[in-house]
Amino acid sequence: MSRVLWTLWVLGAVTNLSKEEAPDQSSSLSCDPTGVCDGRSRSLNSMPSGLTAAVRSLDLSNNEITYIGNSDLRDCVNLKALRLESNGINTIEEESFLSLWSLEHLDLSYNLLSNLSSSWFRPLSSLKFLNLLGNPYKSLGETPLFSQLTNLRILKVGNIYSFTEIQDKDFAGLTFLEELEIDASNLQRYEPKSLKSIQNISYLALRMKQPVLLVEIFVDLSSSLKHLELRDTHLDTFHFSEASINETHTLVKKWTFRNVKVTDRSFTGVVRLLNYVSGVLEVEFEDCTLYGLGDFDIPDVDKIKNIGQIETLTVRRLHIPHFYSFYDMSSIYSLTEDVKRITVENSKVFLVPCLLSQHLKSLEYLDLSENLMVEEYLKNSACEDAWPSLQTLVLRQNHLASLERTGETLLTLKNLTNIDISKNSFHSMPETCQWPEKMKYLNLSSTRIHSVTGCIPKTLEILDVSNNNLNLFSLNLPQLKELYISRNKLMTLPDASLLPMLLVLKISRNAITTFSKEQLDSFHTLKTLEAGGNNFICSCEFLSFTQEQQALAKVLIDWPANYLCDSPSHVRGQQVQDVRLSVSECHRTALVSGMCCALFLLILLTEVLCHRFHGLWYMRMMWAWLQAKRKPRKAPSRDVCYDAFVSYSEHDSYWVENLLVQKLEHFNPPFKLCLHKRDFIPGKWIIDNIIDSIEKSRKTIFVLSENFVKSEWCKYELDFSHFRLFDENSDAAILILLEPIEKKAIPQRFCKLRKIMNTKTYLEWPTDDAQQEGFWLNLRTAIKS
């Protein structure tokens, strides 16, 4: 019994643990408000639960889902797109898609579906895109899969290994299919007319290793197909027989051979096939390999007529293993006379034989980009009578090194108007060059040139010199309409007077820091300007111009996203249209002028106030007093030499010398007075004499009169006495009114003296002789106090 309980407990614990470790499927989805749900690469092993009608798009690709049940998508009635590619799905229940009548995009590619059921697709009446590639089915089922998909426009079916047969019912009902991709790499059986039911199909991509059934498939689609692309096919065994085709009138306009392997012999078969069906205008070879030497044995070349209708031939990345043994292809020269456009890109072309160039009589466009052309071999290719109708020549990314020689080489091309020689290493440019006289377009981008000179033809209407090392553009090109000069080192816009017809200017990613309204207005015909990606200095003038000109946004095609401030530093990286500078930054001159004016007015006001309230006097007196205080004293402060210092006007000297001195110095005991006329030290600064005399006197007697108030030196003596009153906080001043004087006559700056006159008794000289004795008694008492 205990063992049973123990076993049950262990099973319960394991079950709970597995539940805890199992991921929450619904939480593995991230959905936005529009109903787009992303569940890619979440290691899901089953369909998420809780899917509702709110889901519009569901991506569950790159997971580990193996099974889709009837109820998994039941509520997704509004689902438009369902991506389930790259899972391990091997089972889909019959009614799994029953409610997906709104579904337009379904991708079930690269799963493990070995059997396809028509019941899956029957409810999908709105389906436009269906991808079933990479599943291991052998065929498309016993019953028509797609007969109910009347709105289907793009269909992809097949696989590399197991898809071996196409039956006549497989594509029934797909009347209006636009694009079809079939991976028939291992196709072994094709029932005739299996693709015949498809009408007006635009594009068929057919992947097949061996071309055994190629002609049969082509015949069924020839009357409805416009573009056939053949992929990953080994055409080395391909042989075409005219007897295999009954209908020669086709709708096919373009053939593309992608990653196809051909030999000299099989190439002949391709040419015969293209000749036998009329209407082909364009042939394209991409990433193909030619196992041969160019020895194309084409019998009855003169009978090949329809291939002459081909107007465009494109060859990209052609690999020729025996490249250095390759012939000149002279056997097919006559087939090229009516071709108008040829592109041979990245295929190691170093020479176009002169004879071939002369046969290309209708050629208007030739692109030899990413090859090995040099001036010497280009001269042979552009020989006399070569490419007589050529208008556009593209020699981008070859090995050209001299602009002068390149231009001279092309002089034989009388109708040449457009030349692209970008991504060659010219480095320098001569002062003069010769070019075909009808030149209208020249592309010199990415050629490492440092300057542009008169080598540029004046007949140009379009010039591209972008991605070089130019720091100046000063060419006079009177007919130029478009100038592309981005990714250089220009610091300013070109001079508009040199480009009077300019319509388009692209000058982004240079060293331009600003441009003005005047500069743009000087380009009278300019319609388009692209100047983003420069390091703009967002000055007030630049911001005002760019933000206030509403019409500027119509001219600047990359505005505002690519217009960023580089300085000032606090707005670096911000879009020009969003930057706002402060008043101090935008009106600095006015601000400085205002501050200067305010400072001037402040100084002027200060001077007026100083003059009105004797401010200069206060400062002068304070300075003098401080200087005096800093000087070392000749005698200690207690060594007083005089009883009183007498301050008086020269006009009152008679009264002082004959009355005051006589009454005080001849009194017993005598008083010692200090008079400036008698006791000042000769040669000493007068202010120092005044200060020293006041400091060496116990009292200071001021003989006040109208003359005293008007005397300049008396004012100084009053001044320093005034400072002494503040400094010592004493009552050392004795005022004698020699004659009546109003208090207003004493300057208000002598506030202490005025206060003394208001609060203390002063001596007034009596005119009555009887009262004079009392005056002298009071004076002597005041001096002794």
From Swiss-Prot:
**Gene3D superfamilies given for it?**
Ribonuclease Inhibitor, Toll/interleukin-1 receptor homology (TIR) domain
Q: Per the database record, which ranges form the LRRCT domain?
A: 525-579
Q: Where in the cell is it found?
A: Membrane; Cytoplasmic vesicle, Phagosome membrane; Membrane raft
Q: For side Extracellular, which residue ranges?
A: 18-589
Q: Does the keyword Cell inner membrane apply?
A: no
Give the stretches traversing the membrane: 590-610
Question: What pairs make up the disulfide bonds?
Answer: C31-C37, C354-C383, C433-C455
- Asked whether the keyword Zinc is assigned, the reply is no
The membrane topology of this protein is:
Single-pass type I membrane protein
State which ranges are Cytoplasmic (membrane side).
Answer: 611-785
The record ties this protein, via InterPro entries, to: Cys-rich_flank_reg_C (IPR000483), Leu-rich_rpt (IPR001611), Leu-rich_rpt_typical-subtyp (IPR003591), LRR_dom_sf (IPR032675), TIR_dom (IPR000157), Toll-like_receptor (IPR017241), Toll_tir_struct_dom_sf (IPR035897)
Q: Where is this site: Interaction with bacterial lipopeptide?
A: F350
LRR repeat extents: 54-77, 78-101, 102-125, 126-150, 151-175, 176-199, 200-223, 224-250, 251-278, 279-308, 309-337, 338-361, 362-388, 389-414, 415-437, 438-457, 458-478, 479-500, 501-524
Pfam families in UniProt: LRR_8, LRRCT, TIR
The signal peptide annotation in the UniProt record is: 1-17
Its Gene Ontology molecular function terms? Answer: NAD+ nucleosidase activity, cyclic ADP-ribose generating; signaling receptor activity; transmembrane signaling receptor activity; triacyl lipopeptide binding
- This chain is glycosylated at N115, N200, N246, N415, N443
How does it get modified after it is made?
Ubiquitinated at Lys-755 by PPP1R11, leading to its degradation. Deubiquitinated by USP2. Glycosylation of Asn-443 is critical for secretion of the N-terminal ectodomain of TLR2.
Superkingdom classification of source: Eukaryota
Q: What is known of its domains?
A: Ester-bound lipid substrates are bound through a crevice formed between the LRR 11 and LRR 12.
Entry's family note: Belongs to the Toll-like receptor family.
Record's function text: Cooperates with LY96 to mediate the innate immune response to bacterial lipoproteins and other microbial cell wall components. Cooperates with TLR1 or TLR6 to mediate the innate immune response to bacterial lipoproteins or lipopeptides. Acts via MYD88 and TRAF6, leading to NF-kappa-B activation, cytokine secretion and the inflammatory response. May also promote apoptosis in response to lipoproteins.
The molecule here is called: Toll-like receptor 2
- In its UniProt entry, the species of origin is given as Canis lupus familiaris
Give the organism's phylogenetic lineage.
Eukaryota, Metazoa, Chordata, Craniata, Vertebrata
* Gene from which the chain derives: TLR2
